Amino acid sequence: MSTAGGGRRCQAQVSRRISFSASHRLYSKFLSDEENLKLFGKCSNPNGHGHNYKVVVTVHGEIDPATGMVMNLADLKKYMEEAIMQPLDHKNLDMDVPYFADVVSTTENVAVYIWDNLQKVLPVGVLYKVKLYETDNNIVVYKGE
């Protein structure tokens, strides 16, 4: 049997991307309506607005000499479906996701939510990075720090 890297212990990062659609309103209950409007602008519209988010999840670890993989991408897809798609896709984040009842649904906080959910389903220690695209120009990277 051949091993990864000719017998060396090789580390690698593996990423998978998915997309989900969700609506939300940027609004802090600690601020007045006027302050929210000043801070969040049109994103504080009382009727909300939506995004087609893209998420890139990166895991890391040693390349298994028997399989040649850090993680089977089919398994990563299942974990992402459970941790991201089921709770977030086609949802109003503020109304349908209990986490956001007390947390402003900024892209930063959505990335933290995704990280926390993935940590619950992935093997311990493999999650490396969550990269969340709210738009092509607005991107948040979260590494659990």
Curated annotation (Swiss-Prot):
Post-translational modification: Phosphorylation of Ser-19 is required for maximal enzyme activity.
Enzyme Commission (EC) number: 4.2.3.12
Cofactor binding note: Binds 1 zinc ion per subunit.
Protein family membership: Belongs to the PTPS family.
Binding site for Zn(2+): 24, 49, 51
Protein name according to UniProt: 6-pyruvoyl tetrahydrobiopterin synthase
Organism in which the protein naturally occurs: Pongo abelii
Source species taxonomy: Eukaryota, Metazoa, Chordata, Craniata, Vertebrata
Modified residues (Phosphoserine): 19, 28
